[in-house]
């Protein structure tokens, strides 16, 4: 009888330990939210695009979180950002208009300490970050899918999310990203739509 009680107690303690260990570890490794917020920014300005004087009007919307990387002593940060934007580009000389819009979710998913204040960050961006429409609203070009990027950042050792980017590369795409093609000519597209 005593042996039965001891075995059951040992099994119960083992189960509790196994179930609580991952929860305790995940709490220790959960990133601390340094800052979060949202932004809604309408804009209107004159610009020069591909040699054309244009009027640009639109809006940017974002929700973001800046997270302290666990184990970095508050020196490295990762970003999560949901965004959408739209802008109408009008050529006053011709009265022709085109629009550019995008919507996506950007998140830095992995941080590796390189040395000193230098960190490597791996990011994933999903969605439709770049969509071009003609004056009638027809899609003439659309990027969509997943982009993986790698960057190396100098965090400057100041305990703030600002950093200096030392390297940045697009490592992989999944989906359709015609604007990234070697032969893509944005200026030719602009000229065709509003020139």
Give the location of each predicted region.
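Secretory targeting and sorting signals
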Residues: 1-25
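Beta-strand-enriched cores of mature, soluble protein domains
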Residues: 26-195
């Amino acid at each position: 009888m005593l042996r039965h009680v001891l075995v059951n107690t040992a099994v119960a303690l083992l189960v509790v330990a196994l179930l609580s260990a991952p929860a305790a570890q995940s709490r220790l490794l959960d990133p601390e939210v340094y800052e979060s917020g949202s932004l809604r920014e309408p804009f209107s300005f004159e610009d020069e695009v591909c040699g054309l004087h244009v009027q640009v009007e639109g809006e940017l919307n974002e929700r973001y979180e800046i997270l302290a990387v666990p184990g970095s002593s508050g020196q490295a940060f990762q970003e999560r950002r949901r965004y959408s934007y739209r802008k109408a580009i009008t050529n006053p000389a011709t009265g022709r208009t085109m629009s550019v819009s995008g919507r996506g979710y950007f998140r830095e998913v992995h941080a590796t300490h390189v040395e000193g204040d230098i960190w490597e960050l791996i990011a994933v961006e999903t969605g439709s970050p770049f969509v071009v429409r003609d004056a009638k609203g027809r899609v003439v070009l659309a990027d969509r899918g997943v982009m993986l990027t790698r960057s190396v950042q100098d965090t400057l050792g100041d305990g703030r999310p600002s950093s200096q980017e030392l390297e940045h590369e697009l490592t992989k795409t999944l989906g359709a990203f015609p604007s990234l093609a070697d032969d893509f000519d944005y200026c030719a597209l602009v000229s065709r739509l509003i020139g």
